[in-house]
Regions:
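Major-groove DNA-recognition helix of helix-turn-helix-type DNA-binding domains
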Residues: 11-17
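Acidic Ca2+-chelating loop motifs
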Residues: 19-21
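C-terminal catalytic/motor cores of large multi-domain enzyme assemblies
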Residues: 3, 7-10, 25-230
């Protein structure tokens, strides 16, 4: 029985030999599938997003940005620090979103009959789960985190989100959300605002594309960024 509890197996479902369930029977039984603790949250999120798409008057502002210089800087930075302090390009977008939300506080907060500006930036990050759903845990006080700290928080949230082990407090609405696509994916992302927030930043894939520099056509690493805002 102790072995069955450890493996998450219902003893009553096992075949007994002479009315005795053996350890071999327990060990050969398939393990119970891990519980996805975010399942209820994902269902609630789906309902909330459907309502948001119907009720929030979205408008979109789109800009394509040359990332070549930023990526060159990031490669040099990562080469100069220890492996544990290296960061992914995605963290540059998170940091940029934090800076932008600080400079434009009208996009950083919640709407409930009227707008409530947030005292800091609690950055929501859209994360795909292993079961195919989407959750948006938040990084509290992101305005106080440097790139290395942001990277640490992001890695931890993504790991636990995929394992279904996020805390309820981490799944509370942030003050603004960033949703990004993996490199090699679609060019742009037009997101749906996560209520009660009033804005969402969608990051497309970074790829080499034609660009004009000083009147000359060149190849640069660019990304299309889309701001979804509540009109």
């Amino acid at each position: 029985r102790r072995l069955a509890r450890q493996r998450g197996i219902d003893v009553a479902a096992l075949t007994a030999t002479n009315d005795i369930v053996t350890g071999a029977a327990v060990e050969s039984a398939p393990k119970r599938a891990p519980v996805d603790r975010t399942a209820a949250m994902r269902a609630a999120t789906a309902e909330l997003m459907a309502r948001a798409a119907r009720e929030i008057p979205h408008y979109y502002v789109v800009s394509t940005i040359d990332m070549t210089g930023a990526l060159d800087w990031l490669r040099e930075r990562n080469a100069a620090v220890k492996p544990r302090d290296r960061v992914l390009p995605a963290v540059l977008f998170l940091r940029a979103a934090v800076v932008a939300a600080t400079k434009v506080p009208d996009l950083n907060g919640h709407w409930d009959d009227h707008f409530h500006p947030a005292p800091g930036v609690d950055l929501g990050v859209a994360v795909a789960t292993r079961s195919g759903g989407l959750v948006t845990p938040r990084i509290v006080g992101a305005q106080d985190l440097d790139l290395t700290a942001l990277m640490g928080q992001l890695s931890d949230l993504v790991k636990r989100a995929k394992a279904g082990r996020l805390k309820a407090s981490e799944l509370q609405p942030g003050s603004i959300t960033v949703s990004s696509l993996a490199d090699g994916g679609p060019d742009a992302l037009y997101g749906v605002i996560y209520p009660p927030q009033v804005a969402l930043l969608g990051i497309g894939s970074v790829a080499q594309r034609p660009w004009v520099v000083d009147g000359e056509a060149v190849v640069r690493s660019t990304v299309t960024v889309t701001l979804a805002a509540d009109h």
